[in-house]
Amino acid sequence: MNAVTTSGKTQRVRNELSAPMRELSKFLEYNEWDSDFIHFGEGKAYLDTMELEKFGKVRPYDPNSSEEHTRTFPTPRSTGVAIYVFNTLPPLKRERVLLAFKNLCLDSWFIAVRCDPIAGTPHEDGVTTSRGTFQKSYSEKEALAEFGGKVIKKTRGYILLGVDK
């Protein structure tokens, strides 16, 4: 059996904001959010980072990045944002990364995970895709049980959760 990749192979270059970031931006604007953010697992979502900058200072972090400044582990920030990060990690790694993420978030966090069907070969609690990457699709109940918080938006493709400590 081939090894499952949980690295940058899942990153996407986007020409527009990700769907969860569009919704999060509306939420932050409505609530007049002003914060110091960590964009956890930024990947190639530079437009998402630029959108967060409308609401405060942003420190991108991604251990798989080709840019040195985004690979360096950050100091804690008021608010953490992780979009499509945790659904790419198998259970043990996901647990460790979630703990690290929540420890970096002093006041609040927002997490978006996939909830659409994902084709692949069953592997642990998700699937191995044809690209050799791990992906997990969450039900609303699973997402709330694993991450906590409250549902900000649920669509056919993603669930956006948030918590204000």
Residues of each region from the PLM?
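A conserved beta-strand element that flanks and buttresses the S-adenosyl-L-methionine
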Residues: 80-84
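Class I (Rossmann-like) S-adenosyl-L-methionine-dependent methyltransferase catalytic domain
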Residues: 1-74, 100, 108-165
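Short acidic/histidine-rich motifs immediately flanking catalytic phosphotransfer sites
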Residues: 76-78
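A short, conserved alpha-helix within the catalytic core of class I
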Residues: 88-100
